[in-house]
Structure formats: structure tokens, C-alpha cells
Amino acid sequence: MSRPKLEVADIFRRHGAAWRTANKAHLSLGQRRVMTAIEVCRTAALGGHVERCEECAHTRIAYNSCRNRHCPKCQWPAAAAWLAAREAELLPVPYFHIVFTLPAPISAIAYHNKPSVYGLLFAAAAETLTTIAADCKHLGADIGVTAVLHSWGQNLQHHPHVHCIVPGGGISPDGKRWIACRPGFFLPVRVLSRLFRRLFLQGLEAMHAVGELQFFTDLATLKDAHEFRAYLAPLRTTEWVVYAKKPFAGPKQVLAYLARYTHRVAIANSRLLDLDQIHVSFRWKDYRESGCHKSKVMRLDVGEFMAFPAPRAAERFPPHSPLRPLRQHLSRRQAGALSKPTRCALCPDGSP
């Protein structure tokens, strides 16, 4: 695979040291480690190793990778290992994809309270799905959920949302049988949206009551309980975005989807377009456009771009998974191998 003409590492090497000096009072140790890891990834600073093709004996020297979870060049091996573990949890049933998104006013609070609010986002989304699924009016079953947090959008703006992968059914209340949902339909989105709104706001108010939330700059007045309630008041009646995408065809499609999302970094090197002394330009898709997603170009200040590294905790976990007792009763369909070794370009047959 050819090297992109511009990489995140190039931007960090060129502007990182000056930016860290200018922002040293605001940078966490984790952010510094992420930037340093990306800067030295696959350079002599990390040493190297010799790779030898078993077919033609061609050898080459390769520099070692940083293996940091936020590095655009190091995520496939980590994703493969994570997916291998998740493969054992999949069932031979259709899977659904449901997205829970926080409104912009809540995102503003989340920006300075990431561990607390992101944890609440996971918990509220999981409780919403399991509560509605357990209701006999809808499914009447105990379901499993795998959730993945994204704290940014395609344009690198703060946009917390959780992607939930849910099997199309669950275990009966007595734990003895599988209850399947209707073909092509899992749970009503409007019902999910309203319960999610209520659970999240209740949790946020509880955090505020015990002083768990911090407020700065334009939101500093929200430290006052009355101001906080007034800030949340309009959000109690607006529709929160809960989006149900088309169901997956089966476990293979679930794995293919998870491969793109579980270890996703803020921006892939392939999306970068240009860099100068002041700005970085990159491609992004505007998912608010109806029909096909419109590709656009975003131009950010270099300093704003370099602030992208995600939080080091509360990124992804399966919040609710009661399916293990049932797996022994269900036939398993094995997913294909995650990856195969690739021959070098000098082999007579370069294909795997």
C-alpha cells in the first residue's frame, strides 16, 4: 500500500512541539503521550526489524509501530484482535444498528465532563434498549448490546454518540427459549428516544446534585442549580436523535461493520488534503445531507486540528450481554478469517 502524501504524523512532527509548548497548561499526560507516539511511529526512534518473504526470500528493513490506539497507522492489528474476541459472542441471527446522539447543549456539558457524561451516555443507551425490549408490548425478551462510543463527527467537531449493535431477539423471561423480533423491525425509535431522554436527564441531574459536573467559560453559571434546571428545560420536550439503521444480514456483516468502527481514530490519513503554516484541510462527509452523503472540505487551524486525540477511558465496552447461556443451544456460523498474510510485491504471484 502506497504511503499517503500527507499523514497525521507529518502534521504533529511539523507543528507538535510548538503547539505543546503554547498549550502546556491545558494538555494532559495522555494527550502528550498520544502525540509523541504518533510522531515517532515507524521511525528509527522505535527501532526496526527484518521482514523476509517465505516465497522469494526477499528481505527488507521495517521500522516498528507505536501501537497507540489513536494512531491512524496502528489500528488494524488491534482491531483484528478485538474482533477475534467479539466473534465468539456473535449469534447466527440478524443484527440491528441503533445510534444514540446527545443534543448540542448536552455535548457542551460533556466536553468538560467526558468520563462522567460518556459513562452516562453508555448506561442510558443500554438501559433504554434493555427496558423497551423487555416490555411484552414490544419484544418481551432480555437482549444483548455491544456499544461503541464516538466523541467526534466527520468534521472533527465534538459530537458524542453511541453506536449500538443488537441481535434481532433475546432470551425469554424464563431463560429457556429465543424470542425473535419481527423481520426487519426491532424496536420503535420514538419510544426509544423518549425513554433515553428521560433516563439521561435524570442521570445528569443526579450528577449535578452531588457536584460531579464541572462548568467553565460560557457554562460557568450552570453551577447554580436553578440555572442548570433552566438550561435543561427546553431539552425535556425536544426530540432526541435515536437513529435505527437497516438490519445487518448476519454475523459476517456485523464483523465487517465492527472492523470499521471499534478501533476508529478521529481521522484517517487518506482524508488529509493539505497542510501549510496555519491550516489543515481534509475531506469529510456531511451526513445531514439527504440522499447520498455529500463530501465536503473542512479547513481547520493547525492547533484546533491537533486537539483531536480522544479520551483514554470509557471508549467502548459491552454494557449488557446475557446471551452466553443461550449460545450452546444455537447453531453457530463461523465468520471467515480476519486477515491473511500478503506476499511481497516481488513474488511471482503477488496476490495472497
Residue ranges and their predicted role:
Residues 1-352:
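Beta->alpha loop/short-helix hinge microenvironment recognizer with preference
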